[in-house]
Amino acid sequence: VKTSFSGSAPLPLELFKRFEKATNVTIVEGYGLTEATCLVSVNPVDGEKKVGSVGIRFPYTDVRILKQIAGGDVVDCAADEVGEICVASPGVWSGNTYTEADKNRDLYHFGKFLRTGDLGRIDPDGYLWITGRAKDLIIRGGHNIDPAEIEEALLAHPAVAFAGAIGQPDAHAGELPCAYVELVGGASVTGAELVEHCKTHVHERAAWPKHVEVLAELPKTAVGKVFKPDLRKRAITRTYNAALVEAKLNAEVVDVIDDKKRGLVAQVKRTGVLHDEEVGHVLGAFTRPWDWVA
């Protein structure tokens, strides 16, 4: 084996180097999605490979980086400017991507370009770079933070095998960056040490994670992606319970459920005598909803 393929999630440069050194096998990274039927782009097997990019577009595939400007107009981004990756190809069935009609609304730009929900840029040589997911952005007091920068920094640590950065609820800023990691077998490092590591490897101060937690294993999808909804549930539970403890209230979050209309909803249980409005005052300062459970 001389070449292997990587997809499903952006490949950190540090992981690429580790894999190539350990196996002497070169990785060709590409990008595709079910909604477009097949692959969208790939690094050339025999041509120039740009590590960290997902290569150049396939034949008969058109890729544009688009953004919405003031007034609602949609325009193309400049070279190396980050926007939403939008794809038109024979594999994109405009208006019929999903069987549920509601899901197809606002899913296309200019009638045929599928909005992938992925953020990326195209460099002057035509190589596509994925920078994150629009819905994964951490919004701290109105400031957008790309979790990929935090994850790249954590994966640069020799003890870290997998990392997932998300926004944890905050009563003042809306969200603050935090991260969860899975360690390399036999490695040892604390969350506090990784927080300090990020302070020297994450360039933007606002993106420094306020909390890093080491888990025995990160939740993953069937294709090996870090499953961030489970991490968000952990963060909601941790931050809400910390707020309840600080307020000395007899209540705790016992679960976080995924409601189709409201999103993630904390389930709060009474652990003693208290007034309902006291809990409402504390948890009402956060953006994520909550409900009482018996």
Predicted regions and their residues:
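Conserved AMP-binding/adenylate-forming
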Residues: 2-6, 11-30, 34-128, 134-137, ...
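Short proline/glycine- and acidic-rich turn/helix-capping motifs at secondary-structure junctions
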Residues: 211-223, 293-294
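Proline-centered helix-kink/hinge sites
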Residues: 12-13, 26, 38, 57, ...
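Residues at the N-termini of beta-strands
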Residues: 3, 84, 161-162, 211
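AMP-binding/adenylate-forming catalytic core of the ANL superfamily
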Residues: 67, 89, 95, 103-106, ...
